[in-house]
């Protein structure tokens, strides 16, 4: 046991960015680096296929980045209220402040900003994060917040999400976030698989993998949306009530799931309706010999293909 619990007493405590965490920043930077690397080699691609590959790669990177990034975003549910409320325990002092609650898959983020910021001879600008990851103890974090003497609005909202609270918010959001996170990781795995399969002679399976990606992304959204059907405990700060709404992470994930379903459905439909057009679109290469002949090409990527094509002898050359 070290003095001051291993914390330097004369320096400010580390602050958390409201709604923007370090893992989220790392994910964004990694995918931006991949996109920048592709843009560097883009001028080396000739012809109209350059724009096709630009759209294809950037769209695929966006889907993958979104699926990973929302795990670390705190903006699945967002609530904001301006109120006049008590400031500290055992004190009659009141402050006018803006309180914001962000709920993510791994915890909550509470911000308290005075309006104006300087009141009661101090700066009222708090941002506290409470997590419920597998290795984190939410109750212990709340106990530490009590020892630090955080403002009443922060402690009030944090207490509503404790496991022992009669509101039951902890169990609802924790369980929903756990299932949403699991389904999103499955969606990410199928996204990786779809990129591989769409680059093979079997684009049909790539389309099916995209459909599965969209389905699991929507499963994660529905897991979080199921909380709305349960009456939640009211959150009152002073004379105002704080209500949460779907945040940016929720809507972006919903849009990504619908986009994956649309793209996957388009690939599967083209495979059965216009397989040659799909192959030309995905490969962006010269037509093969059977297409030059004007005959029906042999589609190796279609498992339901029943035709048998004879080899084109004009395309066979021998070196004597």
From Swiss-Prot:
Post-translational modification: N-glycosylated.
Glycosylation sites: 84, 109, 121
Cytoplasmic topological domain residue ranges: 43-56, 205-206, 269-320
UniProt record, GO biological process: hydrogen peroxide metabolic process; positive regulation of cell motility; positive regulation of hydrogen peroxide biosynthetic process; protein localization; protein maturation; protein transport; regulation of inflammatory response; regulation of thyroid hormone generation
Topology, Extracellular side: 1-21, 78-183, 228-247
Coiled coil residues, start to end: none
Keyword match rRNA processing: no
Annotated localization: Endoplasmic reticulum membrane
Pfam families the UniProt entry points to: DuoxA
Keywords: Congenital hypothyroidism, Disulfide bond, Endoplasmic reticulum, Glycoprotein, Membrane, Protein transport, Transmembrane, Transmembrane helix, Transport
Transmembrane segments: 22-42, 57-77, 184-204, 207-227, 248-268
Topology relative to the membrane: Multi-pass membrane protein
Predominant location category: endoplasmic reticulum
GO MF terms, alphabetically ordered: enzyme binding
GO cellular component: apical part of cell; cell leading edge; cytosol; endoplasmic reticulum; endoplasmic reticulum membrane; membrane; plasma membrane
Tissue: Specifically expressed in thyroid. Also detected in salivary glands.
Superkingdom of the organism of origin: Eukaryota
Connected disease: Thyroid dyshormonogenesis 5: A disorder due to thyroid dyshormonogenesis, causing hypothyroidism, goiter, and variable mental deficits derived from unrecognized and untreated hypothyroidism.
Function as written in the Swiss-Prot or TrEMBL entry: Required for the maturation and the transport from the endoplasmic reticulum to the plasma membrane of functional DUOX2. May play a role in thyroid hormone synthesis.
Binding partners and assembly: Heterodimer with DUXA2; disulfide-linked. Interacts with CSNK1G2.
Stated name of the protein: Dual oxidase maturation factor 2
